[in-house]
């Protein structure tokens, strides 16, 4: 009877080691695919290879156009340092320049990851920027004449032209976001949706700030 002791002990140790191995074996990874806005998520097989969601031509047009749109806003803010001593306007301009420069990098990466060109086609004779480069006109963008007037202004006159121009510019961006979401099949990419929504919220808030600042100049 006592001769069975070692065998029983080995059996117990074997069972314990198997149980421990089972506990230490990591669970198979779960791949969850986010749904489009308003749609449920999907659970995919663990061996699913990642791929970018399909894009709409309007998505590409929106990103390309918004890069050009942001580029002019950054160009406008670059004038502030040498054209006005208004500290509040300088602070606002620095925020706009920083945020829109970062957003341009995001949009360029988004397009490049999908093999799309960064710049949009510009049929016909486009407007020119302050450096004489061709410039596509998106909603709300300042004309070449408006940009020259802004460049020539100083002090309080510059403040007024900058604020009215940037309010116009921001309202154009809101129009672009609205057009994106009003287009069937567009804006379904999660990254694009989040970016466009954040841009809309940010620019609405900045419009209210600039309207308040503009009142002080009158």
Where are these regions (language model features)?
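N-terminal secretory signal peptides that target proteins for export/translocation
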Residues: 1-3
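All-alpha RGS (Regulator of G-protein Signaling) helical domain and cognate RGS-like helical scaffolds
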Residues: 23-218
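Bacterial N-terminal signal peptides
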Residues: 7-17
């Amino acid at each position: 009877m006592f001769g069975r002791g070692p065998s029983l002990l080995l059996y117990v140790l074997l069972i314990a080691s198997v149980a421990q191995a089972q506990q230490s074996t990591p669970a198979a990874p779960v791949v969850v695919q986010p749904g489009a806005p308003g749609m449920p998520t999907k659970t995919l097989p663990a061996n699913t290879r990642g791929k970018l969601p399909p894009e709409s031509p309007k998505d590409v047009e929106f990103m390309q156009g918004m890069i050009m749109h942001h580029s002019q806003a950054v160009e406008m803010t670059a004038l502030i340092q040498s054209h006005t001593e208004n500290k509040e306007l300088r602070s606002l301009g620095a925020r706009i320049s920083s945020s829109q420069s970062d957003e341009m990098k995001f949009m360029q990466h988004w397009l490049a990851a999908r093999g799309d060109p960064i710049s949009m086609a510009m049929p016909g004779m486009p407007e020119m920027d302050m450096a004489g480069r061709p410039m596509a006109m998106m909603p709300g963008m300042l004309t070449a004449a408006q940009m020259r007037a802004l460049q020539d202004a100083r002090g309080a006159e510059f403040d007024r032209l900058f604020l009215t121009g940037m309010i116009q510019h921001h309202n154009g961006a809101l129009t672009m976001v609205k057009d994106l979401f009003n287009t069937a099949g567009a804006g379904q990419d999660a990254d694009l949706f989040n970016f466009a929504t954040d841009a809309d919220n940010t620019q609405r808030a900045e419009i209210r700030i600039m309207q308040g600042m503009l009142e002080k100049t009158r």
